[in-house]
Amino acid sequence: MTGSISGEADLRHWLIDYLVTNIGCTPDEVDPDLSLADLGVSSRDAVVLSGELSELLGRTVSPIDFWEHPTINALAAYLAAPEPSPDSDAAVKRGARNSLDEPIAVVGMGCRFPGGISCPEALWDFLCERRSSISQVPPQRWQPFEGGPPEVAAALARTTRWGSFLPDIDAFDAEFFEISPSEADKMDPQQRLLLEVAWEALEHAGIPPGTLRRSATGVFAGACLSEYGAMASADLSQVDGWSNSGGAMSIIANRLSYFLDLRGPSVAVDTACSSSLVAIHLACQSLRTQDCHLAIAAGVNLLLSPAVFRGFDQVGALSPTGQCRAFDATADGFVRGEGAGVVVLKRLTDAQRDGDRVLAVICGSAVNQDGRSNGLMAPNPAAQMAVLRAAYTNAGMQPSEVDYVEAHGTGTLLGDPIEARALGTVLGRGRPEDSPLLIGSVKTNLGHTEAAAGIAGFIKTVLAVQHGQIPPNQHFETANPHIPFTDLRMKVVDTQTEWPATGHPRRAGVSSFGFGGTNAHVVIEQGQEVRPAPGQGLSPAVSTLVVAGKTMQRVSATAGMLADWMEGPGADVALADVAHTLNHHRSRQPKFGTVVARDRTQAIAGLRALAAGQHAPGVVNPAEGSPGPGTVFVYSGRGSQWAGMGRQLLADEPAFAAAVAELEPVFVEQAGFSLHDVLANGEELVGIEQIQLGLIGMQLALTELWCSYGVRPDLVIGHSMGEVAAAVVAGALTPAEGLRVTATRSRLMAPLSGQGGMALLELDAPTTEALIADFPQVTLGIYNSPRQTVIAGPTEQIDELIARVRAQNRFASRVNIEVAPHNPAMDALQPAMRSELADLTPRTPTIGIISTTYADLHTQPVFDAEHWATNMRNPVHFQQAIASAGSGADGAYHTFIEISAHPLLTQAIIDTLHSAQPGARYTSLGTLQRDTDDVVTFRTNLNKAHTIHPPHTPHPPEPHPPIPTTPWQHTRHWITTKYPAGSVGSAPRAGTLLGQHTTVATVSASPPSHLWQARLAPDAKPYQGGHRFHQVEVVPASVVLHTILSAATELGYSALSEVRFEQPIFADRPRLIQVVADNRAISLASSPAAGTPSDRWTRHVTAQLSSSPSDSASSLNEHHRANGQPPERAHRDLIPDLAELLAMRGIDGLPFSWTVASWTQHSSNLTVAIDLPEALPEGSTGPLLDAAVHLAALSDVADSRLYVPASIEQISLGDVVTGPRSSVTLNRTAHDDDGITVDVTVAAHGEVPSLSMRSLRYRALDFGLDVGRAQPPASTGPVEAYCDATNFVHTIDWQPQTVPDATHPGAEQVTHPGPVAIIGDDSAALCETLEGAGYQPAVMSDGVSQARYVVYVADSDPAGADETDVDFAVRICTEITGLVRTLAERDADKPAALWILTRGVHESVAPSALRQSFLWGLAGVIAAEHPELWGGLVDLAINDDLGEFGPALAELLAKPSKSILVRRDGVVLAPALAPVRGEPARKSLQCRPDAAYLITGGLGALGLLMADWLADRGAHRLVLTGRTPLPPRRDWQLDTLDTELRRRIDAIRALEMRGVTVEAVAADVGCREDVQALLAARDRDGAAPIRGIIHAAGITNDQLVTSMTGDAVRQVMWPKIGGSQVLHDAFPPGSVDFFYLTASAAGIFGIPGQGSYAAANSYLDALARARRQQGCHTMSLDWVAWRGLGLAADAQLVSEELARMGSRDITPSEAFTAWEFVDGYDVAQAVVVPMPAPAGADGSGANAYLLPARNWSVMAATEVRSELEQGLRRIIAAELRVPEKELDTDRPFAELGLNSLMAMAIRREAEQFVGIELSATMLFNHPTVKSLASYLAKRVAPHDVSQDNQISALSSSAGSVLDSLFDRIESAPPEAERSV
C-alpha cells in the first residue's frame, strides 16, 4: 500500500470516488456490493482503471482482477490482501479412480468447415498451411433482409460482414437420407449438415451405420440457434406439417437418432459457445454410466441472419478488422464462423476389444457455471479455474502433466487475459521455464464457430496428438500486454511445433466457454496404436473391393472417387487394406459393384470402369435387380479343359487346394495319375481317359470352392458326362464312385477314338431332325437350346451336314472330341458298362437333380449301372432340363452356375430360359475362363452370383485404415422466404401485377431485357374488390392487361399488338409473378410461391410492344371516329342489373369500383356511360380496362353464355382520363357459336379516346344447359347449383336396380364356378344355396386365401351383455379390416370380391340394425381404397332368411355392384342423391327463450359457430361441452393463455355480450357418467331444461383400412357412436324439440383414409332414421368439409379427394344457409355437398378420367411392362420431386420420403395413365416402380376366359360411392325431385 491508501476502507473510498468522477455515477448510485458491470464499467474502462490502480498501489493490477473480484468490496479486499504464492495451484489432489472415470476412446471424427474442409485430414492440412477461412458474407446470404425500410437498411449497412462461411449451405443429399424434397426444404440446414457429417464420422470410425440399428447409441449435439426455423415461420402461409420438426432445436439430435434407429439418449445441447464441448462431456458420462455403448458427440453452427451479428456488434464483441487475433496485443474481437464437427466415442476397453483405431483417449472432463459474475455475458476467472481443477482431478492427472491446451481464445482484449490467467494459475505455474504450457486457438483459422467451437478445437487437438505436432496460432505477433506469459509459464504456439518430448504420452486439454457462463474443459491423451498380431497381417494375393451405394449413380460416383484417391492421397495404403475397409467397415446398400484385382493398377482400372459403367476384367457392375431365389449348379461334359487350369486356385484359394488334397488318394486310385500334379504343373490333359477324369476332379474341387464362399446348390443338372459330377454333388454317389463311373466310361470309349464325330448346329430340334432324316447313322445327340442342337455320327456324314447348314448362312462347326457319345455306336459298349458297374449301390440324392438322360424329366433315376449305360447312349435333353428348372411347378430356379474350367453352356442356358419365360430375370454364370487368371475370374463370377448382398470376403485383423467417405449427391433445398417490400418477390403495385424491375444486360448488341417480379398473395391482391369464378378467385383480365400495358409504358411504348390470353391466374394461393420484356415481346408467367426453382412456370399472356406514342395517338383517334358514333336508330335502354348479369355467368364481384350511368344498345353496338370513384388516382387505367373488358363480354345481353378473353389484335393508350365519367363504346364485329369479337373505345365525354381495343375476341364457355334463371328458378343449372347453398342439400333416394332376382319364378339358373368363403352369422344355410348355384362355398375363413368371393355376414347381436355399441363396432371393424388386409396381400392374378351383408340398416328400427349401421360407412371407404377387391354391401330385411337369399346372392356375385344395395321383397334398390325440393313442411327454427340448448363439441371452432347460430334463433341459454376444460374465469385475462384458448374465451364473451348465458362444461360425451353428472347438477341447480341438442363432438384419425387398429378405431368411434348413444338414452324421442347430429359425408362418399370416421358417421345417420320414425325431429347432417374449420381444417387429403370427384368444401355461411333450408323438410339424413357440373355435358361421363389412354390388350407382355415402368416412373418422380432419370426402379418409395398424401396423388395420376381404378394401398403393397409395374401389368393384361367376367367387373366400376352417386343423379327419374 502507498502512503495515501492505508487499507481496504481507503481503497473502497478511492474506487467510489473514481466511479463518480470518471464513469458518471452519483454517490447514491454506487453500491459497493453491486457488480462493476452493473455500475457501468466496460471492458475498456477496466483496462484504464487497472492502469490507475497499478500506479496508485505500486503493483501490477490486471483488468482480469475485476472479473475475479467483480464488486467494489470484493476488489478492495483482494487488492488490500497480500499477494498469493505463485505456486499455490501447481498441484491438484489426485482422487481415487473408479469405473465412472473410465477412459473414453475417440474412434472416429468428421467435420465440415469453411475453406474447403470436408474431413479431419483436410482440416489438418489447412491448419499446418497457416490458412484462414475468413471472408465477407456471401452476397446471397443476406439477400432476404435487404431492401427493407430505411432504418433497417441503415442498421444492416452498419453490421459487420466479416465471417467464416460454408459454401452451398442449401445443398443436401435428401435422397440418401430418405427424406422427401418437401420435408428437406423445411429442415434447418444444421440438421442436414449434421446428418452428413455424422455419417462421415461413423465411416471414419469404421462403423457401418446400419449396424447401429436399435443399439444403445447416444447422440449429443451442440447447437445454439435455429435461424432457419425463424425464417421459415416468418411467412405463416408457408408453414406446413414439416415446419415444426424442421425448425426445432431438439430435432438436430433426434433426426440422426431417427434415421439410424438409435435407442440411446438423444440430446440437443445449448450452452452457446461451449455447446459441443459440453456435448462431449455428457457423452462421456453416458458411456461411463452405460446409458449408451457408443456415443456420437457433435456441434453445428450456421449463420443465416444478420440479427446476431448486429447484437454482438452492439456490444463491441466482433472484430471490425475481420480477424481473430487470440492472445495478441491487437486483439479487437472475434469473427463468427460456421461449421460442423462430429466425434465417435467408445469406452476404451470396448474399443480395444473391437480392434478400433483409437485416435485419442479422453481421460477426464468437467463442466461448471460462472454463476452471478460481473455480468451475464462476462467471464468468471474463478469459475474457469475451478473447471480446470475439476477436469484434471477427474482425469487423475497432475495439471503440470498436460503439454498443450487448445484455448477458447476468442481474441477479445479482456477475454483472452482472463482465460490465460486461469490457465496459467492452474496449469502453468510450477513448470520449468524451459517447458511452458503451450496454448493456441483454432479460431484464428476458422473464426468462432460458436456451438461448433468446442468440437472444432477438440478435433484439432486430437489431430495434433496423433501427428505429434502443434499447428501455429495465427495472427500472433505481439503478446497481449495484460497476459504475463513468463510468470504464468505459458507460450503461444506461433509456428509449426513438434510435440514436446516429456517421457509420457502426449496430453492436452481443450477449453470452451459459453457466453451465458457454462464452462467446459476436456483432457485427452495420445491413443495406443493397435497392431495386428504377428503373421496375421499378410495381404491376400487377390483383393475384392465392394463399392456400395443406394443407387447405381452413387456406386459410380464412389468408384470414381476411390480411384482418384488411390492414385493420390491414398497411394501408400495397401490394396488389401482398402478392400478391408470397404468390405467390412461400410454399410450395406441396395446397389453395389465389385472389383477384383491382384494389384493397385488393376484395381484402379477396375474402379474407373465401374465408375463409367463399363465392362472390364474383374469388374461386376451393379445388378439391375435380383433374379430371384434358387441356385442350380450345371456340370458340363467334356471340352472345358485347358493347360494351366486351377494352378492359381491351388496357390491362392485354400478351399480349392483342400478339396484337391482330399480327393487326391481316390483320384490316383481310379485315374492312375495325380490331379494335384497336373494342376500345379499346368500340364495338358491328353486322351479321353485323362480328360474325363481330370474334368470331374476339377468340377468336384470347384464345387467345394463355391460352397466355401456360401454359394450352394439347391438343384444340380449334368450335361452328358457332367451328370456323373452332378450325381456326386447331389449325394447319390460318393466321389470314389463317381470317379469309378467316369474311369469305366472313358476306358470303354477309348478304343473308339477317331471313329465318329459331333457338330454344333444353329438349328432348332425340328429343323435338325428334318435335316438328318436322310442320314440314318446320324442322330440328334444333344438338345442344347431352342436354337442349338448337336448331332453325332460318322465323320464323313457329319462334315456333309455341316456344309449344308453353312450353305444356309447358319452356324455349324465340328465339336473337338475324340469319341462321339449319344449315338448308335454306343450300343456295343452298354453291356460292358452294365457289367463293370453292376455292384454300384447309389443312394437317394440329398440335393435335387434333374437328369438329362431321359426325355421324361419326371423320371426319378436310380444312378446305377443301367443308368450310366443309358446316359452314354441316349440324347442329352439339356434344353428341356434347364427349361423345367427355370419354370418348374415346384418353384422356379433363377441362378445357374456352370461348374467347369471354361464356360460351354452359359449362353445355351440363358437362351433356353428367356425362350421359356420371356421377361423373367435369370443369371447364368461360368466359373473359370480359359487362359485367364483363375482366381480373378472365379472371384468375378462369385461376385456376379451375389445380387442382393455383397459376397463374403475374409476379415483381416484390425485396425482398418480410413478411406474417403461417401460422396454426396447434393440438390438445393431452401425455403421460399417472404421478402420485404422492394426486394425480389415484393408485393405488386396497385392495379397491376408488376413488382420490382430489373434490367438484364444481353451479350449481343441487342437492347437489354427487362424483368418485373412480384409475389401475389390471396390476402393482398392489387385490386380492391373480388373476382370469383365458381367460388374461386381469379385475377381479372383487366388486371393482366393493365400489367403488361404499364410495363410497356415504362419502356416508352403505348400500344400492344397480338395479345394472346393463354391460362387464367388463380389467386386462391400465393404465386410468384414474372413479367418479361425481351426485344419487342412481352409475356406474363407465374409459378407457385411455395415451390422450388424446378417448378414449372405457367404462361398466362403474351403480346408484342408495337407503336410509338405519336403513332398510337393518331390511330386511336381514327378508331374512335370510326366506332365511337352510335347509329341513328340507337335507343336508350333500362340499365340492367350488372351483378345479376355477371352472376348468371358464374362471376361474382368486380375487382374495381365503377357503376353504369346509362345503357344504350342496338343490334351490334352498345354505348355505356360509366362513373368512376372520385378518389381515383389521376391516370389510373385499371378501372377503365375493367369496365371495358366486362362490358364487352355483355355486349349481347340475351346471350347468357360465359365469355372469356382470348385475344386482342391491338390495344392502344391515349390521353389520361381526368373526369369521373367516361363512355365505353362497343362495336360487335363478329358473333358465332364459338364466341364474339368486339371493338372497344373508352373516352371521356366530348374528349379524345383514352383507350382503344381492336378485335377483342372472346371465347364462349358453354356448360351444356341454359344457365339463365327465372324468379324463382324452375331448374338449376350447373353454375347456380354450385353457388347457391340451398342446392347443396340432398337426400338419398333408393331406386330400383335392374339386377336379376333368381328367386322369381322362371329366372334363369346360371352357374358361376368359383370358391366362396362365407364368414359370420348363419352361414350354413347360405352355403347350401350357393353350392346349388354352382359355387364352391367354404364356411368361416377356411377358404379366404383361395376364394374368389368372400361374403361377410355381419353379427346381429353383441358378444355379451356388457358389449356396448362402440365395443361391437370395434370388434367387427377389426375383423373386417383384417379380412381386407389378407385379401389385399394376395397376388393381382388371384383377385377376390368382398361382400358384406347387413340386416335392417335401411330402416334402422331394430337395435341390431342400428349396431350394424356403421358398416355402411366403412364399406364406402373400402370401395375407395381397394376397388380391386370390393364387391358391394347388401342390406337384407331384418327377418329375411339367408338360405332363401342364396340364389339372389349368386346373381349379385357375378357382377359386383361396388355400391350399397338394399333388398326388400325381392327388389334390389340402389342409392342416388336427390335434391330437396318442394314446399317446406316446417317453419324456420326458433328457440324457446326459457329453455337451454346443448352443443357437444361446443368449445371447438364449429361448435362455437353453431352456438352463435342458435343465438341468432333466440337461444338465451347454451350448454357447451368439450373434452378440455377452460381455465377459471378469474384467469381469462392472463397474457399467458394460448391462442386457441383465447379464441374460445373471446367467442363466449361475444355471446354473453348478446345476452346469452353460456355454461362451458368439461365432459366426455361418450362417458355416460359424465353426461349423467352434468344433467344431475343442472337439476340440482334448478337450471332451465334442455330442449335441443346439437351433437358436434368428434375426432378423426386418418388411417388406411389395412392399417387400422382397434385402439385407433375406438378413439374415433367413442365420441360419435358412444356419445350419440348416451345422448339418445338421456334424451329419448319427445323430450327435446330437435336433435341434430353433425355427421360427415365421408360416411357415404368413401374418402380414402377416413374408414373409422366414415363408419362412426354412418351410425349417426342410422340413429337419425330411428328417432325420426319415433316422431322426434332428428336430423343427421352429412357435411363435406367446412372450409378451414373443424376436423377437416388440415385435411388436405379430403380436399383433394373432393376435388377429384368434382366437388369442393363449403364455407360456414353456405353451411348454415343449407341447414336452415333443409330444416324445413321432413328429412332424417341430409347430404350437404356442392354438386359438380353434370356428367356428360362435354360428352364424357363423370368418370371419363378412367378411360384408358392405351389399349393394353393388344400389346405384348414385355411392351406392357416397359410402358408401365416408363409412365409410372414419370408420375412418381414428378410427385416426389426427384429427376426422372435418377429414380431407381428398384428403390423403395419409403426411402424417397413417400407419405400418404403423395401416395393418393400418385394413385390419381396412375389411374388416369393406366385406365383402371387402383387401390389406396397400392404403393405400399408394391413399393418400387418395378414391382408396381409388374402388379399393374397383371391387372391390365388379358386373363383366361374363366376370369374375364370377374376382372372386368372388378375394374370397370367407378369405385367410390361418391362417383356412383354422382353418376346416378343424372339418371334419376323425375319423381326423385319430389318434396321430401
Curated annotation (Swiss-Prot):
Q: How is the cofactor bound?
A: Binds 2 phosphopantetheines covalently.
* Metabolic or biological pathway: Lipid metabolism; fatty acid biosynthesis
Cofactors needed by this protein, per the record, are: NADP(+); pantetheine 4'-phosphate
Q: Which CDD domains match?
A: KR_FAS_SDR_x, PKS
Q: Name one GO biological process term.
A: fatty acid biosynthetic process
Recorded GO CC terms = polyketide synthase complex
Q: Which reaction does it catalyse?
A: icosanoyl-[(phenol)carboxyphthiodiolenone synthase] + 2 (S)-methylmalonyl-CoA + 3 malonyl-CoA + 5 NADPH + 10 H(+) = C32-carboxyphthiodiolenone-[(phenol)carboxyphthiodiolenone synthase] + 5 CO2 + 5 NADP(+) + 5 CoA + 2 H2O; docosanoyl-[(phenol)carboxyphthiodiolenone synthase] + 2 (S)-methylmalonyl-CoA + 3 malonyl-CoA + 5 NADPH + 10 H(+) = C34-carboxyphthiodiolenone-[(phenol)carboxyphthiodiolenone synthase] + 5 CO2 + 5 NADP(+) + 5 CoA + 2 H2O; 17-(4-hydroxyphenyl)heptadecanoyl-[(phenol)carboxyphthiodiolenone synthase] + 2 (S)-methylmalonyl-CoA + 3 malonyl-CoA + 5 NADPH + 10 H(+) = C35-(phenol)carboxyphthiodiolenone-[(phenol)carboxyphthiodiolenone synthase] + 5 CO2 + 5 NADP(+) + 5 CoA + 2 H2O; 19-(4-hydroxyphenyl)nonadecanoyl-[(phenol)carboxyphthiodiolenone synthase] + 2 (S)-methylmalonyl-CoA + 3 malonyl-CoA + 5 NADPH + 10 H(+) = C37-(phenol)carboxyphthiodiolenone-[(phenol)carboxyphthiodiolenone synthase] + 5 CO2 + 5 NADP(+) + 5 CoA + 2 H2O
Keyword terms of this UniProt record: Fatty acid metabolism, Lipid metabolism, Multifunctional enzyme, NADP, Oxidoreductase, Phosphopantetheine, Phosphoprotein, Repeat, Transferase
Q: Where is the active site?
A: 273, 408, 448, 720, 1027, 1186
**Record domain Ketosynthase family 3 (KS3): where:** 101-526
The ranges of region (N-terminal hotdog fold) come to: 997-1112
Residues where O-(pantetheine 4'-phosphoryl)serine is found: 43, 1796
Chain residue ranges for the region called C-terminal hotdog fold: 1130-1267
Could you state a single Gene Ontology molecular function term?
3-oxoacyl-[acyl-carrier-protein] synthase activity
Annotated segments matching region Beta-ketoacyl reductase: 1491-1728
Q: Which residues form the Carrier domain?
A: 9-83, 1759-1836
Residue ranges, annotated region (Disordered): 1102-1130
A Pfam family this protein belongs to?
KR
Residues the record lists as binding NADP(+):
1491-1551
* Its EC number(s): 2.3.1.292
Keyword DNA-binding attached: no
- Give the residue ranges for region: Acyltransferase: 626-950
Q: Locations of Low complexity compositional bias?
A: 1106-1115
> Ranges for the PKS/mFAS DH domain?
997-1267
Main function: Part of the PpsABCDE complex involved in the biosynthesis of the lipid core common to phthiocerols and phenolphthiocerols by successive additions of malonyl-CoA or methylmalonyl-CoA extender units. PpsA can accept as substrate the activated forms of either icosanoyl (C20), docosanoyl (C22) or lignoceroyl (C24) groups from FadD26, or a (4-hydroxyphenyl)-C17 or (4-hydroxyphenyl)-C19 fatty acyl from FadD29. PpsA initiates the biosynthesis and extends its substrate using a malonyl-CoA extender unit. The PpsB and PpsC proteins add the second and third malonyl-CoA extender units.
What is the official name of this protein in its record? Answer: Phenolphthiocerol/phthiocerol polyketide synthase subunit A
| Protein species of origin | Mycobacterium tuberculosis (strain CDC 1551 / Oshkosh)
